[in-house]
Amino acid sequence: MTLTIDHAKKLVIEFCATYPVASTISYKIRETQEELYGPQATREAAGTILGSFRPGRGRAEFAISNFRDEDHFRRTLRHEVLGHYGINTFNPAEKRAVLEGVIQSRNDPGMAALWAEVARIYPQLTDSMKAEEVFAFACERIVSPIRGNVAEGARSFRETCIERTRAMQVSDLINLTSMVAEGLHDR
């Protein structure tokens, strides 16, 4: 099924109904990535761009022609909004601590696949930017509605990001992303 701009807008409205805090940012949905980023942003020059989150503008942007179907779009919504917007709901010191925890986890067997995917897609990024992408890719796997254990998320955050008493494992990343998603759902 080809995704239309109108259908994508309906999916954003559904997403914001599930995650009310997501309605505090704006959404820019266009047919092509050139319409979003300019004529120089062709697939040949920039690669395929599904979407992005611009924290300074508080806006998620999506190029509809690059999506296979609505599930692909929903997954990218979770990536951009739960991941990139969600990580920015931490204060700067907490966000840095989360990113450092994710960076330190790169050799964990459960985290290696996420790190490899990010390294393949974004080889030019700094470790900190790659860590944010790892976080965002983990958010793609969140299934709505969120009913995570906030206490477990807080424990994982404290132990792996603040106190650093142990290395982050994939279960901790799941706890953290679920805690963020639940925060966007419950506020």
Predicted segments, located by residue:
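Zn2+-dependent metallopeptidase catalytic core
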Residues: T2-S26
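Flexible, glycine/threonine-enriched loop-and-boundary segments that flank and lead into catalytic domains
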Residues: I29-S52
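Short pre-active-site segment immediately N-terminal to the catalytic Zn-binding motif
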Residues: R57-R78
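Post-HEXXH active-site segment of zinc metalloproteases
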Residues: D71-R75, G86-P123
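Pan-zinc metallopeptidase signature
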Residues: A116-R187
